[in-house]
């Protein structure tokens, strides 16, 4: 009897040890610092009502006009091949559908508008309707001087957005702010005064301190958007996001070659010689961030994580969370609840 009791106790202790061992590793480094997972470099949307992802790992796209399809179809396919070449599983599909089928179910398709003109590129993040089309859209305006490789790289960047990837350089953990700019312990140094449109914003604000305030257009993404200021594409991402970094990442934690990063002269004004001024550099030795050359393996890791979290589902956003799409409804229901005393 004593032996059986001893075995029972030992089995209970063993089960408890296994339970606590599994609980200690149950966090996910995408949202919990210190979770025991490998560290990789990427940042993507937090799937939600505002930023839904594509079902069945499939994006169906269509062109706005037959002429656009004839001109740009090969460029789109070449860009998608860069993702496969970097190791993206072929379970991810980016396939063309007919305009008629997509117009019948616009929420299930990505509208591609491509043309030549003043360079401009923007894309829905996941299945996010954007103005002025009220559709999931990829907008591509090429200058006309780009070669085939340059086009493919630009489109591959936009495809990353379409799936839900964010700009690598906009990870909030990479940024540390000083009184008027970025601190020396920030992983990047930002030169707001060199960004196109700064002079107009400075004139409108008319206060240097307010430019760099916590809610100023050189520091706050939402405020920069209000001014139509391109710094919004460079400074930290404000909405919810997921990424794997520890609380204080190092320079080596950043994928400086990511297809989703901006090179150091992006949106820079011209200097007296007609060259673009620096807008964003690495703090380490003030190194210049190069123009992305292709999709990296770590870009692929980020996309795979977005559609296949290592520990199952993403965290649930409860209705009583202020960031929940149902928060307003929740508050209204609470007010109408009958409380018995």
Tell me the role of every PLM-derived stretch:
Residues 1-26:
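Fungal secretory targeting signals
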Residues 23-341:
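Zinc-dependent metalloendopeptidases
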